[in-house]
Amino acid sequence: MKPVWIKHAKELATIAGENGARKGKDMSELAIIEDGSVWIEDGKIAAVGTTAELEEQFANRTHEADIVDATGRLVTPGLVDPHTHIVYGGSREREFEMRLEGATYMDIMNAGGGIHATCRMTREATEDELIEQSSRRLDSFAKHGVTTVEGKSGYGLDLETEMKQLRVAKRLNEQHAVEIIPTFMGAHAVPNEYKGNEDAFVDLIIDEMLPVVAKEKLAIFNDVFCEKDVFTPEQSERILEAGKKLGLTPKIHADEIVSYGGAELAAKVGAISAEHLLKASDQGIKDMAEAGVIGCLLPATALFLREEAAKGRQMIDSGMAVAISTDCNPGSSPTTSMPLVMNLACISMRLTPAEALVAATINAASAIKVENRVGSLEVGKQGDLVMWDIGSYQELQYLFGVNHVDKVWKKGQQIVG
C-alpha cells in the first residue's frame, strides 16, 4: 500500500491530547493545526504537523505517496458511532405514522410492535439477508464520515437469534471497511412468551446466553434496557454483574422514558457508558461523573420521538465525559448521519461545536474502548480520517442537513470519494 500524504488542510482538527475520554473544558480542545498535514503509512498515522514540517520530514519520499490536496478543507478523525443496532431485519416505517397519530413508544411496544416486531423479522431473516441489509447501512455510515461503529444484538431475544446477530456482526467486521465493535444485548426487551415471568427470562440470559457469548468471544460489552415495564434495576444489575464475571464490560440503556435509577446503577456497576439518559436525575448525573461513566447521548432519538433531549450541558458542566451517537435502529432513530447528530447535540443539548466533535470522536471511541487506535489524529493510531468540503469545524455543525463529506479513509485506504 502506498503512503497517503494529505496536505494544506485549512483546519486539521487532530483532537490530540491525553488519551481517553475528555471531560469539562477539555471537551473544547481540538488541537487544530492550520495548513495541516498527515502522513499515513501501512494503515497508520506516521506523522502529523504543518505542511511545511511534513514537507521537510519526508522530503526524500514525497514521490512515493498518493498526495491529497486539502486546500480550503477541514480534516478530522473518522467519526465514531458508539451506539447502534445495525444488524436487524425488516423495517418499521408504519410506526412513524402511528406516533404522529398519537401512539407512544410503550403503546406501540405493548401492541406487539416496536422491538417485538423487529425481533420477528430478524428471527425470520437468514444470516446472508442480514449481511446484505446491514452492509447497506454501513455503506451509508461511511458516506457520512463514520469509520467505526458499535453494533448491538437485541433483536432476537432467544439464544439462536441473538447469536445469529452477533455472528453477522463478526462477519461484517471481516468483510466491510467500517469497523464494528460488538455488544450483546439480549436484555433489550422481555419476549412475549415470558410476559409475567420476567425473572425466568433473566435466568435464561444469565445461564444460557451470556456463557455462549463469552465462550465464542462474540461481544466485548453486555448491555441491558433498564426501564419501567422492561427490566428493573435489580434485574439489570444481575445481568450486568453476570456479564462482568465472564469478562464482558457493562453498558446500560438508562432513564430513557422515566427516571428509574438507571444512571445510579451505571455508576454502581462501573459501566463504561450509560445510554439515552433523557430522564436521568441530578443525583444520577453526579454519581456517573464521580464514577467516570461516559454519558452516551442520542439526540436524534429524542427528536424522532418528540421528547426533550438529555441534559448534555449539565452533564459536561458536572464533570461527565459525554459521547454522542445516532442510535441507528428501525424504530426510534433510523439514521446513519453523525453530522446531523452533532448539529442536534448543539441545538437540543447546548453543546458547542467543538464539544460535539469531541463527543463524536475521541469520547465516542472511549465509550467502546477503542480510543487507543481511533478517535484522534496522532502518530501510531489508525489512518482513519475525513476530509470535508468546508473549511472550519464550526461549519460542520452550522451548515446542517447537508452531507459535507468529501473523502474518507479507513486504515489508510480511501473508502469514500
Language-model region placement:
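Divalent metal-coordination and catalytic microenvironments
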Residues: A9, V38, G43, G72, ...
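Histidine-rich, glycine-flanked metal-binding segment
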Residues: K2, A13-T76
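Metal-coordinating catalytic core of metallo-dependent amide/deamination hydrolases
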Residues: G114-S134, D139-S140, T147-Y260
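Active-site-adjacent C-terminal substructures of enzyme catalytic domains
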Residues: T249, S259-S376, W388-Y393, F400-V402, ...
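Short, compositionally biased
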Residues: T62, Y398-V408
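Conserved beta-strand scaffold positions in the cores of enzyme catalytic domains, especially
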Residues: W5, E64-D69, P182, V408
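Metal-associated gating/positioning segment near the N- to mid-region
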Residues: R61, A65-Q133
